[in-house]
């Protein structure tokens, strides 16, 4: 063998050795040690624990919100369950008041009927009061569009504009919620 061939043969194993060394170094760099793996797992575990803790807090808050909403809905249902029924009874109160207004107070023959209607109306209004149904009678008060419905406006001298001068139909509230607005005649400037 010539010197050149010997040099080439010697050079090849050295190249392989360098390549093997680089591959081994790369393998060592790629393969983390047990401590590094443990550290990575601990970091990942800490992240998962934090995410679970946050999810737990959100879930507890959601449960609390659902519970509060359910309690509020139950209270609301109890408070306003009578709204439709009360609305139907308002016409009874209106008719009793109209009946009283139609009877002649001076006629002795109708005195018994008048007293009967008055007692019936009083009994109905007392029942309304027991269930927090309040009557709105805004005679001589300023007009309030949240509680009153203006049926007409009439120019009236010596009366402040936007004052209720006549109540055509009384309004009612159930636990502070308007069931029916008072239907009124309102004054306007002449």
UniProtKB/Swiss-Prot annotation:
Region (Disordered): 1-33
Keyword list, A-Z: Chaperone, Cytoplasm, Stress response
Localisation: Cytoplasm
Positions with biased composition (Low complexity): 11-32
Pfam families per UniProt: GrpE
Superkingdom of origin organism: Bacteria
GO molecular function annotation: adenyl-nucleotide exchange factor activity; protein homodimerization activity; protein-folding chaperone binding; unfolded protein binding
One GO CC annotation: cytosol
An individual GO BP term: protein folding
Record's function text: Participates actively in the response to hyperosmotic and heat shock by preventing the aggregation of stress-denatured proteins, in association with DnaK and GrpE. It is the nucleotide exchange factor for DnaK and may function as a thermosensor. Unfolded proteins bind initially to DnaJ; upon interaction with the DnaJ-bound protein, DnaK hydrolyzes its bound ATP, resulting in the formation of a stable complex. GrpE releases ADP from DnaK; ATP binding to DnaK triggers the release of the substrate protein, thus completing the reaction cycle.
Binding partners and assembly: Homodimer.
Family: Belongs to the GrpE family.
Name under which the protein is recorded: Protein GrpE
Species assigned in the record: Alcanivorax borkumensis (strain ATCC 700651 / DSM 11573 / NCIMB 13689 / SK2)
């Amino acid at each position: 063998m010539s010197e050149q061939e010997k040099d080439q043969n010697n050079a090849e194993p050295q190249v392989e050795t360098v390549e093997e060394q680089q591959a081994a170094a790369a393998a060592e760099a790629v393969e983390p040690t047990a401590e590094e793996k443990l550290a990575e797992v601990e970091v990942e575990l800490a992240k998962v624990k934090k995410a679970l803790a946050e999810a737990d807090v959100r879930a507890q808050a959601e449960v609390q919100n659902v519970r509060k909403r359910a309690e509020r809905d139950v209270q609301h249902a109890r408070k306003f369950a009578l709204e439709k029924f009360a609305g139907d009874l308002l016409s009874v109160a209106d008719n009793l008041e109209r009946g009283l207004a139609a009877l002649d107070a001076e006629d002795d023959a109708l005195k018994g009927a008048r007293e009967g209607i008055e007692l019936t109306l009083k009994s109905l209004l007392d029942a309304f009061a027991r269930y927090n149904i309040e009557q709105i009678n805004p005679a001589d008060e300023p007009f309030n569009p949240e509680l009153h419905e203006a049926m007409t406006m009439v120019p009236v001298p010596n009366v402040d504009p936007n004052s209720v001068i006549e109540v055509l139909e009384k309004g009612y509230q159930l636990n502070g919620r308007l069931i029916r607005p008072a239907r009124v005649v309102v004054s306007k400037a002449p």
